[in-house]
Amino acid sequence: MSFTDTPDGFRSGFVSFVGRPNTGKSTLTNALVGEKIAITANQPETTRHPIRGLVHRDNAQIIVVDTPGLHRPRTLLGERLNEAVKDTYADVDLIGFTVPANEKIGPGDRWILEAVRKVSPKTPILGIITKADSVSRDLVAAQLMAVHELLGGNSEVVPVSSTSGENVETLIKVMTDLLPEGPKFYPDDHITDEDTNTRIAEAIREAALSGLKNELPHSVAVEVDEILPDPERNGVLAVHAIIYVERVGQKDIIVGHKGQRLGRIIHTSRQDIIKILGQNVFLDLRIKVLKNWQSDPKALNRLGF
Protein backbone atom coordinates (compact mmCIF):
# COMPACT_ATOMS: atom_id res chain seq x y z
CA MET A 1 0.00 0.00 0.00
CA SER A 2 1.55 3.29 -1.09
CA PHE A 3 1.18 6.55 0.81
CA THR A 4 -1.22 7.75 -1.90
CA ASP A 5 -3.68 4.94 -1.05
CA THR A 6 -6.12 6.42 1.45
CA PRO A 7 -9.17 4.95 3.20
CA ASP A 8 -12.70 6.13 2.51
CA GLY A 9 -13.55 9.36 4.32
CA PHE A 10 -9.88 10.38 4.65
CA ARG A 11 -9.49 14.15 4.98
CA SER A 12 -6.54 16.30 4.00
CA GLY A 13 -5.70 19.90 3.34
CA PHE A 14 -3.67 22.99 4.08
CA VAL A 15 -4.19 25.12 7.19
CA SER A 16 -2.54 28.52 7.60
CA PHE A 17 -2.08 30.13 11.00
CA VAL A 18 -2.38 33.91 10.93
CA GLY A 19 -2.14 36.58 13.57
CA ARG A 20 -0.03 39.37 14.92
CA PRO A 21 3.69 38.75 15.36
CA ASN A 22 4.57 36.78 18.50
CA THR A 23 1.17 35.14 19.05
CA GLY A 24 2.71 31.68 19.30
CA LYS A 25 2.10 30.42 15.76
CA SER A 26 5.49 28.73 15.39
CA THR A 27 5.33 27.11 18.82
CA LEU A 28 1.86 25.81 17.98
CA THR A 29 3.10 24.42 14.66
CA ASN A 30 5.83 22.50 16.48
CA ALA A 31 3.32 21.16 19.04
CA LEU A 32 0.97 19.91 16.33
CA VAL A 33 3.74 18.25 14.31
CA GLY A 34 5.26 16.75 17.46
CA GLU A 35 8.75 17.86 16.52
CA LYS A 36 10.57 21.17 16.18
CA ILE A 37 10.46 22.38 12.58
CA ALA A 38 9.89 26.12 13.08
CA ILE A 39 12.27 28.31 15.05
CA THR A 40 10.93 30.28 17.98
CA ALA A 41 12.23 33.38 19.74
CA ASN A 42 10.99 36.02 22.15
CA GLN A 43 11.24 38.68 19.46
CA PRO A 44 8.27 39.32 17.17
CA GLU A 45 8.59 38.73 13.41
CA THR A 46 10.90 35.72 13.85
CA THR A 47 9.29 33.67 11.05
CA ARG A 48 10.40 34.90 7.64
CA HIS A 49 8.92 32.42 5.18
CA PRO A 50 6.01 30.00 5.14
CA ILE A 51 6.98 26.71 6.82
CA ARG A 52 4.94 23.57 6.18
CA GLY A 53 4.57 21.10 9.02
CA LEU A 54 2.86 17.75 8.53
CA VAL A 55 0.36 16.30 10.99
CA HIS A 56 -0.44 12.61 10.40
CA ARG A 57 -3.48 10.80 11.81
CA ASP A 58 -5.24 7.60 10.74
CA ASN A 59 -8.12 9.58 9.26
CA ALA A 60 -6.36 12.73 8.10
CA GLN A 61 -3.24 14.52 6.96
CA ILE A 62 -3.01 18.19 7.86
CA ILE A 63 -0.40 20.43 6.27
CA VAL A 64 0.09 23.34 8.68
CA VAL A 65 1.54 26.44 7.04
CA ASP A 66 3.27 28.65 9.60
CA THR A 67 3.54 32.13 8.11
CA PRO A 68 5.26 35.36 9.12
CA GLY A 69 3.00 37.56 11.23
CA LEU A 70 1.13 40.17 9.23
CA HIS A 71 2.36 43.63 10.17
CA ARG A 72 2.61 47.17 8.85
CA PRO A 73 5.92 46.96 6.94
CA ARG A 74 8.83 49.34 7.53
CA THR A 75 11.22 47.81 4.99
CA LEU A 76 11.15 46.15 1.58
CA LEU A 77 11.64 42.84 3.40
CA GLY A 78 8.49 43.54 5.42
CA GLU A 79 6.55 44.27 2.25
CA ARG A 80 7.72 41.02 0.64
CA LEU A 81 6.89 38.99 3.74
CA ASN A 82 3.36 40.41 3.79
CA GLU A 83 2.90 39.54 0.11
CA ALA A 84 4.12 35.98 0.73
CA VAL A 85 1.64 35.64 3.59
CA LYS A 86 -1.27 36.90 1.51
CA ASP A 87 -0.36 34.50 -1.31
CA THR A 88 -0.49 31.67 1.24
CA TYR A 89 -3.97 32.68 2.45
CA ALA A 90 -5.36 32.33 -1.06
CA ASP A 91 -4.15 28.73 -1.41
CA VAL A 92 -5.24 27.07 1.85
CA ASP A 93 -8.38 25.16 2.87
CA LEU A 94 -8.64 26.61 6.37
CA ILE A 95 -7.30 29.65 8.21
CA GLY A 96 -6.47 29.50 11.91
CA PHE A 97 -6.78 33.00 13.38
CA THR A 98 -4.49 33.12 16.42
CA VAL A 99 -4.97 35.40 19.41
CA PRO A 100 -3.02 34.96 22.67
CA ALA A 101 -5.04 34.43 25.84
CA ASN A 102 -3.00 36.99 27.75
CA GLU A 103 -3.54 39.97 25.42
CA LYS A 104 -6.73 41.86 24.65
CA ILE A 105 -7.97 41.99 21.07
CA GLY A 106 -6.81 45.22 19.48
CA PRO A 107 -6.75 47.17 16.20
CA GLY A 108 -3.94 44.96 14.87
CA ASP A 109 -6.10 41.84 15.17
CA ARG A 110 -8.99 43.53 13.39
CA TRP A 111 -6.67 44.79 10.64
CA ILE A 112 -5.33 41.26 10.06
CA LEU A 113 -8.80 39.70 10.01
CA GLU A 114 -9.93 42.29 7.47
CA ALA A 115 -6.86 41.62 5.30
CA VAL A 116 -7.44 37.86 5.43
CA ARG A 117 -11.09 38.16 4.46
CA LYS A 118 -10.22 40.52 1.63
CA VAL A 119 -7.67 38.11 0.13
CA SER A 120 -9.56 34.89 0.83
CA PRO A 121 -13.26 35.68 1.41
CA LYS A 122 -14.56 32.10 1.03
CA THR A 123 -12.00 30.28 3.19
CA PRO A 124 -13.39 29.17 6.58
CA ILE A 125 -11.73 30.72 9.63
CA LEU A 126 -11.12 28.87 12.90
CA GLY A 127 -10.37 30.90 16.02
CA ILE A 128 -7.39 29.68 18.07
CA ILE A 129 -6.58 31.10 21.49
CA THR A 130 -2.90 30.45 22.13
CA LYS A 131 -0.99 30.49 25.43
CA ALA A 132 -4.12 29.28 27.27
CA ASP A 133 -1.98 28.13 30.21
CA SER A 134 -0.72 31.67 30.85
CA VAL A 135 -3.98 32.99 32.39
CA SER A 136 -6.88 31.77 34.53
CA ARG A 137 -9.72 29.72 33.06
CA ASP A 138 -12.07 32.69 33.55
CA LEU A 139 -9.84 34.88 31.39
CA VAL A 140 -9.58 32.12 28.76
CA ALA A 141 -13.39 31.93 28.70
CA ALA A 142 -13.65 35.70 28.31
CA GLN A 143 -11.13 35.66 25.45
CA LEU A 144 -13.00 32.78 23.82
CA MET A 145 -16.19 34.85 23.79
CA ALA A 146 -14.34 37.92 22.49
CA VAL A 147 -12.77 36.00 19.60
CA HIS A 148 -16.09 34.34 18.78
CA GLU A 149 -17.72 37.78 18.65
CA LEU A 150 -14.89 39.13 16.47
CA LEU A 151 -15.15 36.29 13.95
CA GLY A 152 -18.95 36.23 13.97
CA GLY A 153 -21.22 33.65 12.41
CA ASN A 154 -20.76 30.02 13.37
CA SER A 155 -16.96 30.12 13.62
CA GLU A 156 -15.48 27.68 16.12
CA VAL A 157 -12.90 28.83 18.67
CA VAL A 158 -10.44 26.49 20.40
CA PRO A 159 -8.17 27.46 23.33
CA VAL A 160 -4.85 25.63 23.30
CA SER A 161 -1.54 25.48 25.16
CA SER A 162 1.43 24.52 23.01
CA THR A 163 3.72 24.12 26.02
CA SER A 164 1.51 21.84 28.14
CA GLY A 165 -0.18 20.16 25.17
CA GLU A 166 -3.66 21.00 26.50
CA ASN A 167 -6.28 20.78 23.73
CA VAL A 168 -3.72 20.07 20.99
CA GLU A 169 -5.55 16.87 20.01
CA THR A 170 -8.88 18.69 20.23
CA LEU A 171 -7.57 21.32 17.82
CA ILE A 172 -6.40 18.60 15.41
CA LYS A 173 -9.88 17.01 15.50
CA VAL A 174 -11.62 20.34 14.87
CA MET A 175 -9.28 21.16 11.97
CA THR A 176 -9.80 17.67 10.51
CA ASP A 177 -13.59 18.10 10.56
CA LEU A 178 -13.26 21.41 8.69
CA LEU A 179 -11.05 20.00 5.92
CA PRO A 180 -12.35 18.39 2.72
CA GLU A 181 -11.99 14.72 1.89
CA GLY A 182 -8.80 14.16 -0.05
CA PRO A 183 -5.62 12.13 -0.54
CA LYS A 184 -2.35 12.00 1.38
CA PHE A 185 0.08 14.55 -0.02
CA TYR A 186 3.16 13.26 1.84
CA PRO A 187 4.44 9.92 3.21
CA ASP A 188 3.77 9.28 6.91
CA ASP A 189 7.43 9.64 7.89
CA HIS A 190 7.70 13.22 6.59
CA ILE A 191 7.33 16.07 9.11
CA THR A 192 8.13 19.01 6.82
CA ASP A 193 8.92 19.78 3.21
CA GLU A 194 11.62 22.29 4.15
CA ASP A 195 14.92 21.72 2.37
CA THR A 196 17.97 20.89 4.47
CA ASN A 197 19.86 24.14 3.85
CA THR A 198 16.88 26.22 4.95
CA ARG A 199 16.46 24.22 8.16
CA ILE A 200 20.17 24.61 8.95
CA ALA A 201 20.11 28.35 8.25
CA GLU A 202 17.08 28.74 10.51
CA ALA A 203 18.76 26.78 13.32
CA ILE A 204 21.74 29.14 13.16
CA ARG A 205 19.50 32.22 13.05
CA GLU A 206 17.55 31.02 16.08
CA ALA A 207 20.77 30.65 18.07
CA ALA A 208 21.97 34.05 16.87
CA LEU A 209 18.71 35.75 17.93
CA SER A 210 18.94 34.52 21.51
CA GLY A 211 19.38 37.49 23.83
CA LEU A 212 19.34 40.15 21.11
CA LYS A 213 17.33 43.32 21.70
CA ASN A 214 15.87 46.30 19.87
CA GLU A 215 16.23 46.28 16.07
CA LEU A 216 19.24 43.95 15.80
CA PRO A 217 17.18 40.72 15.51
CA HIS A 218 15.57 42.05 12.32
CA SER A 219 19.01 42.75 10.82
CA VAL A 220 20.21 39.14 11.10
CA ALA A 221 20.06 36.80 8.09
CA VAL A 222 21.80 33.47 7.51
CA GLU A 223 22.97 31.78 4.32
CA VAL A 224 24.38 28.24 4.10
CA ASP A 225 27.34 28.41 1.72
CA GLU A 226 28.11 24.70 1.34
CA ILE A 227 28.02 21.32 3.08
CA LEU A 228 30.95 19.00 2.35
CA PRO A 229 32.65 15.96 3.87
CA ASP A 230 35.27 17.26 6.28
CA PRO A 231 38.67 16.42 4.71
CA GLU A 232 40.35 16.22 8.14
CA ARG A 233 37.68 14.31 10.10
CA ASN A 234 36.31 10.96 8.99
CA GLY A 235 32.50 10.75 9.11
CA VAL A 236 32.11 14.47 9.79
CA LEU A 237 30.30 16.98 7.58
CA ALA A 238 31.70 20.51 7.34
CA VAL A 239 28.90 23.09 7.23
CA HIS A 240 30.02 26.51 6.01
CA ALA A 241 27.56 29.32 6.70
CA ILE A 242 27.42 33.12 6.86
CA ILE A 243 25.56 35.38 9.27
CA TYR A 244 24.72 38.71 7.64
CA VAL A 245 24.11 41.92 9.57
CA GLU A 246 23.56 45.47 8.30
CA ARG A 247 26.22 47.46 10.18
CA VAL A 248 29.74 46.96 11.57
CA GLY A 249 28.54 47.66 15.11
CA GLN A 250 26.05 44.81 14.80
CA LYS A 251 28.84 42.45 13.77
CA ASP A 252 30.70 43.30 16.97
CA ILE A 253 27.60 42.48 19.04
CA ILE A 254 27.15 39.09 17.35
CA VAL A 255 30.82 38.20 17.91
CA GLY A 256 30.69 39.32 21.54
CA HIS A 257 33.53 39.86 24.01
CA LYS A 258 36.54 37.81 22.86
CA GLY A 259 34.26 35.87 20.50
CA GLN A 260 32.28 34.34 23.36
CA ARG A 261 28.85 35.07 21.88
CA LEU A 262 29.79 33.65 18.49
CA GLY A 263 31.10 30.56 20.27
CA ARG A 264 27.73 30.06 21.98
CA ILE A 265 25.90 30.46 18.66
CA ILE A 266 28.11 27.78 17.08
CA HIS A 267 27.72 25.41 20.04
CA THR A 268 23.92 25.77 20.24
CA SER A 269 23.13 25.61 16.53
CA ARG A 270 25.56 22.73 15.94
CA GLN A 271 23.44 20.49 18.19
CA ASP A 272 20.35 21.20 16.07
CA ILE A 273 22.27 20.72 12.82
CA ILE A 274 23.50 17.30 13.98
CA LYS A 275 19.85 16.30 14.52
CA ILE A 276 18.86 17.62 11.09
CA LEU A 277 21.68 15.85 9.25
CA GLY A 278 21.87 12.77 11.46
CA GLN A 279 25.64 13.03 11.44
CA ASN A 280 28.50 14.69 13.31
CA VAL A 281 29.17 18.23 12.12
CA PHE A 282 31.93 20.82 12.08
CA LEU A 283 30.32 24.27 11.80
CA ASP A 284 32.32 27.05 10.17
CA LEU A 285 30.43 30.27 10.81
CA ARG A 286 31.47 33.65 9.45
CA ILE A 287 29.89 37.08 9.92
CA LYS A 288 29.62 39.63 7.13
CA VAL A 289 28.14 43.10 6.80
CA LEU A 290 25.55 43.42 4.02
CA LYS A 291 24.62 47.07 4.31
CA ASN A 292 20.87 47.76 4.68
CA TRP A 293 20.02 44.37 3.17
CA GLN A 294 16.40 44.56 4.38
CA SER A 295 15.72 47.35 1.87
CA ASP A 296 18.07 46.24 -0.93
CA PRO A 297 16.24 44.31 -3.70
CA LYS A 298 19.40 42.55 -4.91
CA ALA A 299 20.38 41.47 -1.40
CA LEU A 300 16.85 40.23 -0.69
CA ASN A 301 16.82 38.21 -3.91
CA ARG A 302 20.18 36.69 -2.99
CA LEU A 303 18.87 35.69 0.44
CA GLY A 304 15.74 34.13 -1.02
CA PHE A 305 13.16 36.79 -0.17
Swiss-Prot record:
**Where does it localize?**
Cytoplasm; Cell membrane
GO BP:
ribosomal small subunit assembly
Region of interest (G2), residue spans: 45-49
Q: Quote the record's binding site residues for GTP.
A: 19-26, 66-70, 130-133
What's the protein's topology in the membrane?
Answer: Peripheral membrane protein
Subcellular location, principal = cytoplasm
Is-annotated flag, keyword GTP-binding?
yes
Query: CDD domains under this entry?
Result: Era, KH-II_Era
Region of interest called G5, as start-end residue ranges on this chain:
160-162
Q: Which Gene3D superfamilies match?
A: 3.30.300.20, P-loop containing nucleotide triphosphate hydrolases
Per the database record, which ranges form the KH type-2 domain?
Answer: 212-291
According to the record, the residues making up region (G4) are: 130-133
What ranges does the record give for the region G3, renumbered to this chain?
A: 66-69
Q: Which PROSITE patterns match?
A: G_ERA (PS51713)
User: What GO cellular component entries does it have?
Assistant: cytosol; plasma membrane
Q: Name one GO molecular function term.
A: GTPase activity
Q: Where do the segments described as G1 lie? A: 19-26
Ordered alphabetically, the record's keywords are: Cell membrane, Cytoplasm, GTP-binding, Membrane, Nucleotide-binding, Ribosome biogenesis, RNA-binding, rRNA-binding
Q: Which residues form the Era-type G domain?
A: 11-181
UniProt record similarity statement: Belongs to the TRAFAC class TrmE-Era-EngA-EngB-Septin-like GTPase superfamily. Era GTPase family.
- What role does it play? An essential GTPase that binds both GDP and GTP, with rapid nucleotide exchange. Plays a role in 16S rRNA processing and 30S ribosomal subunit biogenesis and possibly also in cell cycle regulation and energy metabolism.
- HAMAP family documented for this protein: GTPase_Era
Entry-linked PANTHER family: GTPASE ERA (PTHR42698), GTPASE ERA, MITOCHONDRIAL (PTHR42698:SF1)
| NCBIfam families with a match to the protein in the record | era, PRK00089.1, small_GTP
Subunit structure as annotated in this protein's UniProt entry: Monomer.
Name used for this protein in its record: GTPase Era
Q: What is the lineage of its organism?
A: Bacteria, Bacillati, Actinomycetota, Actinomycetes, Mycobacteriales
Give me the gene this protein comes from. era
